[in-house]
Amino acid sequence: MLHLVDFALLKPYLTVEEIVEGARKAERLGVAAYCVNPVYAAVVRPLLSRVKLCVVVDFPFGALPTAARASLASKLAEIAEELDVVAPIGLVKSRRWADVRRDLISVVGASGGRVVKVIVEEPYLTDEERYRLYDIVAESGAHFIKSSTGFAEEAYASRLGNPVHSTPERAAAIAKYIRERGYKLGVKMAGGIRTKEQARAIIEAIGFGEDPTRVRLGTSTPEALA
């Protein structure tokens, strides 16, 4: 199962030493990718050989202007194999779909062919918003729909009737939409995945097998899934 895991250390208070130790753990466990904030990309790069480097873009709010997001993605693509890009959540909630489309096409296009996972922040979305956003993610050329930053505000999510953590039901719904639309997208679930039982249930709910090009699980505690 670890070959499907993106080990993420993204808390703002983590030290350089903790990020370096995380890289060593990632290599030791043999996860799919080690995901860090942009400031640590150059530090982590030489520490990884069998594990891919993943860097987040405009995390966790998706609130930078498109030009800044695209420029950052372009620079990070010189270092990292994978980019986890937060969708422009405010534009999504404003239902400014043309702006969302322009943004994601620009950012993915600037990513130099690297694997791009677009974080749609499921806890904040209505069904209408999420399905429109999935369509735009597919159109942008991204490779994965990623469910959440793991930083979503529970009070707002609960107003919409959404959980803040990953669930098999949400994973199944994303995968079902991808299948029905014929999209070649993977599914990455993140947020609250802390046991092997949870992870297994989510993998089975997605139904894409155990192919790391189609399925990923984001967690800050990968040893719990070993």
From Swiss-Prot:
Pathway assigned in UniProt: Carbohydrate degradation; 2-deoxy-D-ribose 1-phosphate degradation; D-glyceraldehyde 3-phosphate and acetaldehyde from 2-deoxy-alpha-D-ribose 1-phosphate: step 2/2
Keyword list, A-Z: Cytoplasm, Lyase, Schiff base
Active site: 84, 146, 188
InterPro entries: Aldolase_TIM, DeoC, DeoC/FbaB/LacD_aldolase, DeoC_typeI
Catalytic reaction list: 2-deoxy-D-ribose 5-phosphate = D-glyceraldehyde 3-phosphate + acetaldehyde
This protein's name: Deoxyribose-phosphate aldolase
EC code(s) of this entry: 4.1.2.4
Its job: Catalyzes a reversible aldol reaction between acetaldehyde and D-glyceraldehyde 3-phosphate to generate 2-deoxy-D-ribose 5-phosphate.
GO cellular component terms, semicolon-separated: cytoplasm
Family: Belongs to the DeoC/FbaB aldolase family. DeoC type 1 subfamily.
GO process terms (BP): 2-deoxyribose 1-phosphate catabolic process; carbohydrate catabolic process; deoxyribonucleotide catabolic process
Cellular location(s): Cytoplasm
A GO term, aspect molecular function: deoxyribose-phosphate aldolase activity
HAMAP family named in the record: DeoC_type1
